[in-house]
Design a protein with these regions (language model features):
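Bacterial Sec-dependent N-terminal signal peptides
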Residues: 1-23
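Beta-strand-enriched, solvent-exposed domains that form extended recognition/catalytic surfaces
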Residues: 26-151
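Fold-level signature of zinc-dependent metallopeptidase catalytic domains
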Residues: 152-207, 220-230
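Solvent-exposed loop/turn segments at secondary-structure junctions
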Residues: 183-186, 224-228, 282-286, 302-304, ...
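Short pre-active-site segment immediately N-terminal to the catalytic Zn-binding motif
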Residues: 191, 287-311
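Active-site-proximal segments of metallohydrolase catalytic domains
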Residues: 215-291
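Catalytic Zn2+-binding segment of zinc metalloproteases
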Residues: 312-328
Length: 424
């Protein structure tokens, strides 16, 4: 018995070292960024190469190289060109995928600038990009060879300094968040620094982030805009800002986003990061976020703290909106005959992959929204922008309304799992 225990402990001891060995064998401790264009309409999509960019920092894990979540509308893989072995993979979503569900996408084509990042390969690789089909399955859409000896790899310039907000851990063993200013002028950089510390404390006020305070790094980048604020098109307000953010994205007032993702990446490259969060210097109510893409929200609205936490739930943990009675631009974001990939909503098509095992047998399904079930994990109809056919795990949660001050147990668990993936 003692011999078996010793063998198991030795296995646990050497397992992380094996991961580090694979990283060192195949990757440099810096970032390769693939910029590309992604276009199409409601029915079709196409890709076109833009540029290879080398960035100086790699903040990601050296052991969690292969995605284990299968979240996102898209995914990509880095495969060794000689053996075909998958060396690195991640899931993600983009603004283009949301636009495809709007009315406009049935009338015209649009093209968006996108990118994916990975540790810099030491040897030639093939990078494959995948997109989910109508059934929710990944299909390969684009493939590119990469050679680290390519003389046309752009060396990313670093025009802006970064500063530490909260940095207790080695980037390789931490979740690294970079805060980027939008609509802060040079004279407002002191305010941006204060906002960075304010929102860092906001993050650590919520479970489960407060349980990982020593494993989360937060940095800010001093990147000023020429003008203060953000665009509000319907009011004729246009600001000259670094990231071209605007209210009324897809015609929805509170949806504050930017389609200039290349500019976002160029600024983010100035610091080590896993996740990008953009703070917009405006008292308006708004924000937005997309999984493994970026999050963005206002700095001084009275609800700014909860907006920040809600939006980071989208971009970091892949959480879905659980509300269904607010204005959105999307049409059938979630087909009712397909199980959504997000961990906190279900169509019951494959409920066994979600929180089914956490629902008491005695609970009715669907679970009525009644006070006696206020603290019960159940199957509550309404979520993902639909009143019927999509279900959420809790009556209320920060992914639903701001009447509550906490995430539900299912969202907490999803956030916790994602943090653990980054820090190991």
């Amino acid at each position: 018995m003692h011999r078996l225990t010793l063998i198991f402990l030795l296995y646990l001891f050497f397992l992380p070292n094996k991961g580090f060995a694979q990283f060192d064998a195949f990757f440099e401790n810096k970032t390769l960024r693939l910029d590309y264009y992604h276009g199409g309409n409601a029915q079709n999509e196409y890709y076109a190469f833009d540029a290879w960019i080398e960035e100086p920092y790699w903040a990601g894990s050296h052991t969690s190289l292969i995605d284990t979540f299968q979240y996102g509308q898209y995914s990509f893989e880095v495969n060794d060109r000689e053996t075909g072995k998958t060396l690195y993979s991640r899931g993600y979503t983009t603004l283009f995928s949301e636009w495809q569900t709007t009315n406009e996408a049935h009338e015209i084509d649009r093209v968006f600038s996108e990118s994916v990042v990975m540790p810099f390969p030491k040897k030639p690789v093939i990078i494959n990009l995948f997109s989910r089909n109508r059934s929710g399955l990944f299909e390969k859409k684009f493939s590119l060879p990469f050679d680290p000896a390519d003389p046309y790899i752009i060396q990313q310039s670093l025009p802006y300094p970064f500063f530490d907000v909260h940095t207790p851990a080695n980037p390789a063993n931490a979740l690294d968040i970079v805060l980027i200013p939008e609509g802060y002028t040079a004279s407002e950089m002191d305010q941006f620094r204060k906002d960075c510390h304010k929102f860092a404390e906001e993050l650590f006020a919520y479970e489960p982030y407060n349980q990982f305070r020593d494993k989360i790094n937060i940095r800010g980048i001093e990147a000023p805009s020429a003008e203060s604020g953000t665009d509000i098109p319907v009011k004729g307000i246009w600001k000259n800002t670094l990231l071209d953010s605007r209210m009324y994205t897809f015609g929805v007032e509170r949806y504050l986003m930017t389609s200039n993702f290349k500019a976002v990446r160029n600024v983010a490259a100035c610091a080590p990061y896993d996740q990008i969060y953009i703070l917009v210097n405006t008292p308006e109510y708004g924000g937005g976020a997309i999984f493994n893409h970026y999050a963005l929200s206002v700095n001084s609205n009275r609800s700014a703290g909860k907006i920040f936490i809600h939006e980071f739930g989208h971009s970091f943990a892949g959480l879905a909106d659980e509300y269904y009675n607010s204005e959105v631009a999307y049409n059938e974001m979630y087909p009712l005959d397909v199980e959504p990939w997000e961990p906190n909503i279900t169509t019951l098509v494959n409920f066994g992959k979600k929180w089914q095992d956490k629902v008491a047998d005695s609970l009715p399904k669907p679970t009525p929204v009644e006070n006696k079930y206020l603290n019960a994990i159940g199957v509550y109809e309404g979520g993902g922008y639909a009143a019927k056919g999509i279900y959420r795990p809790y009556i209320d949660c920060l992914m639903n309304t701001f009447r509550t001050n906490s995430f539900c147990p299912i969202c907490k668990d999803a956030i916790r799992k994602m943090i653990e993936f980054y820090i190991h």
